[in-house]
Amino acid sequence: MHFFDEDTRQFWGPAGSEEEAYASIEKLDDNAYYIAYASLEKLTSYAHFYNWAKNREMDANLWCAVYTSDEDGYMCDSVPVGMLINPSGSCIDWDRETYPYLCQLDNRADTDSWHISEDTEKMETHFISLLSYLRDHQEIVKILNGDQEIPYDTMIESVKQDGLRIYGFSIVCQKKKLLQLWDEEGISYLYAVPLD
């Protein structure tokens, strides 16, 4: 999470100021892998974000943070929520009517499902199904988040009303990619932790 220091007029994140975050990236090992966390300067539509990532050959193993808001427009107070944008998961059996595209690879015989990431409407359906499934299966949520109350219905309504709005992402990469990302317009903060 970020916070804005009114006195210094700087944003601070997990790695400190922007300058401190950049300095920490410069010190990384060239050959090691890291989990990079990036915040975007502004909310971005899923379609725009996907195309941006694909043009940079980052559309594989990329997790995007989805912004959901309450009826007053404030970000839902909960754990960060998001999704992988590339087809992932295995084809398991579930109620496809209640949770369409719960698994992006809904039907292995359907080669179109390999391109689901390019279809904003299907990705919205996928994300809504993920949230709905978690809402309806609290035993999974308890394992992940204990007894924390998560406003799934509010999040679902937000996506239905405003679509998928991306505010950040995470990717596994090496130092070279981190330095390239640092130079990208549209990224407001970037830091990395070693991949263990």
PLM-predicted stretches and their roles:
Residues 1-104:
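Extracytoplasmic beta-rich ectodomain segments of secreted or membrane-anchored proteins
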Residues 9, 56, 96, 108, ...:
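Arginine residue identity/basic-tract feature
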Residues 70-145:
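Low-complexity, serine/threonine/proline-enriched polar segments
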Residues 119-196:
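Extracytoplasmic/luminal low-complexity segments enriched in Pro/Gly and acidic/polar residues
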